[in-house]
């Protein structure tokens, strides 16, 4: 009897071990499976909400109702009221819509052409409808040719009005087809170099990044005179800090040189010797990260001025409840002169001001770094990286790339 009991116990233990082993194998297999992905955002580990149209995330990950895939805001979440708790039913969490691809799919022929070039090891450089060159376009930095097209709505640029403004995209494969997601704005300073915010490219694979020059309407697919160039190298400031946006600046080295002309030209960079008065009219130029429904995402220009530091600090403190907030010394704030401004502007967009001594010549004074506003609740100043504080950093990397620093300054020494 004792012998039979021992056998029974051993048999039971063996069954338990077998069950545990099967469970371990199943869990291992599940762990190796990739999470479901929509856009560039993994959704498998998040709770679904809004009839599967969104997921529950922390409030600082949700900008204007949509997942923020670029970066996070600097300011801690404000104190919440009972009314702020939604169907996620967790303090500090909210239902946020999943990101969508901002650019329509390219035609099958265009996709095949790009894929063939990449398979051959080449970089993608596309220029659509051929148009004659402009013999009178200025080879000076920061200058534009005469613009005759008129914008349909206030706040929209004319095509090629700011030819140094570029759009940065991330490419991904979806069901065997290439899709591009708009990430950020950027500014051309050399035919091989683009300045943008570090948050736009931090931890990004350079092989997935492309810039488009000569763009106007991001919803229009291909446009005449548009150039698309792959990114060959990312240079992120070594001191960049994600949480505080300290040194939020990066250089993109392009795989091929841009064809400069009416649709694509570089901006000037100012050092501290270039002084802009408090009443200098400037523009924030770029696209919206969250365009309004049933509207095209065309390039915008927002009339702006540099805001006093005290005023900027006060509005951000009031808006966020972060009463110990201090503006970084390498940052500036802008104030908008128009009553109607789009809710969300893309990081990396340029803040350009006209030269005080050379009318018609524009300098890149700031790079859009972050914003803390909630459009329907309050208005606060946007924060920009102050470009003159980074001229030495830019010059050093430009020299390392065997390029000339005079190219983004008035009266370039050489144009080769």
From Swiss-Prot:
Region spans: Disordered: 100-155
Entry-listed glycosylation sites: 294, 400
Domain-related comment: The clip domain consists of 35-55 residues which are 'knitted' together usually by 3 conserved disulfide bonds forming a clip-like compact structure.
Cellular localisation: Secreted
Main location: secreted
One GO CC annotation: extracellular space
GO terms for biological process, alphabetical: antibacterial innate immune response; defense response to bacterium; defense response to symbiont; positive regulation of melanin biosynthetic process; positive regulation of melanization defense response; positive regulation of protein processing; proteolysis
Biased composition (Acidic residues): 106-116
Domain Clip: 48-97
Description of the deletion phenotype: RNAi-mediated knockdown increases the number of P.berghei oocysts in the mosquito midgut. In the hemolymph, prevents the cleavage of TEP1 into its mature form thereby preventing TEP1 binding to the surface of bacterium E.coli or parasite P.berghei ookinetes. In response to E.coli infection, cleavage of CLIPA8, CLIPA28 and CLIPC9 in the hemolymph is impaired and phenoloxidase (PO) activity is severely decreased. Also reduces E.coli melanization.
Transmembrane stretches, start-end: none
Protein's name in the database: Inactive CLIP domain-containing serine protease A30
Disulfides per UniProt: 49-95, 56-88, 62-96, 184-200, 282-353, 312-333, 343-375
Keyword line: Disulfide bond, Glycoprotein, Immunity, Innate immunity, Secreted, Serine protease homolog, Signal
Family classification: Belongs to the peptidase S1 family. CLIP subfamily.
Biased composition (Basic and acidic residues): 146-155
Signal peptide per UniProt: 1-39
UniProt cross-references to Gene3D superfamilies, sorted A to Z: Trypsin-like serine proteases (2.40.10.10)
UniProt feature coiled coil, ranges: none
InterPro entries: Peptidase_S1_PA (IPR009003), Peptidase_S1_PA_chymotrypsin (IPR043504), PPAF-2-like_Clip (IPR041515), Ser/Thr_Proteases_Immune/Dev (IPR051487), Trypsin_dom (IPR001254)
Superkingdom of origin organism: Eukaryota
SUPFAM superfamilies: Trypsin-like serine proteases (SSF50494)
Subunit structure: Interacts with mature TEP1 and to a lesser extent with full-length TEP1; the interaction is induced by microbial infection.
């Amino acid at each position: 009897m004792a012998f039979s009991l021992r056998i029974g116990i051993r048999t039971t233990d063996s069954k338990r071990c077998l069950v545990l082993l099967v469970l371990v194998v199943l869990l291992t297999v599940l762990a190796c499976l990739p999470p479901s992905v929509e856009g560039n955002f993994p959704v498998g580990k998040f709770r679904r909400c809004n009839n599967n149209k969104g997921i529950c995330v922390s409030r600082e990950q949700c900008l204007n109702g949509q997942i923020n895939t670029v970066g996070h805001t600097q300011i801690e979440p404000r104190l919440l009221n009972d009314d702020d708790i939604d169907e996620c039913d967790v303090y500090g969490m909210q239902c946020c819509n999943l990101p969508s691809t901002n650019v329509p799919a390219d035609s099958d022929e265009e996709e095949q052409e790009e894929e063939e070039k990449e398979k051959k090891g080449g970089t993608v450089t596309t220029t659509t409808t051929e148009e004659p060159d402009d013999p009178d376009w200025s080879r000076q930095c920061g200058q534009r040719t005469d613009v005759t097209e008129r914008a349909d709505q206030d706040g929209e640029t004319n095509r090629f009005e700011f030819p140094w403004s570029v759009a940065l995209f991330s490419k991904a494969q979806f069901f065997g087809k290439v899709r591009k997601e708009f990430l950020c704005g950027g500014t051309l300073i050399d035919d091989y170099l683009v300045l943008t915010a570090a948050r736009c490219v931090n931890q990004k694979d350079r092989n997935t990044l492309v810039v488009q020059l000569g763009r106007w309407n991001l919803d229009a697919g291909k446009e005449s005179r548009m150039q698309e160039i792959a990114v060959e190298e990312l240079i992120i400031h070594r001191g960049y800090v994600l949480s505080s946006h300290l040194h939020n600046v990066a250089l993109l080295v392009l795989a091929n040189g841009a064809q400069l002309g009416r649709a694509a030209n570089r901006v000037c960079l100012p050092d501290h010797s270039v002084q802009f008065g408090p009443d200098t009219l400037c523009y924030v130029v770029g696209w919206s990260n969250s365009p309004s429904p049933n509207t095209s995402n065309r390039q915008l220009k927002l009339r702006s001025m540099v805001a006093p530091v005290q005023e900027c600090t006060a509005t951000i403190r009031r808006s966020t409840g972060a009463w110990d907030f201090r503006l970084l010394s390498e940052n500036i704030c802008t104030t908008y002169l128009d009553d109607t401004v789009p809710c969300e502007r893309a990081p990396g967009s340029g803040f350009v001001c006209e030269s005080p001594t050379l009318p018609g010549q524009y300098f890149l004074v700031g790079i859009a770094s972050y914003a803390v506003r909630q459009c329907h609740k309050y208005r606060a100043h946007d924060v920009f990286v102050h470009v003159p504080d980074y001229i030495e950093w830019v010059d050093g990397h430009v020299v390392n790339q065997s390029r000339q620093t005079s190219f983004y300054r008035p009266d370039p020494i050489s144009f080769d």
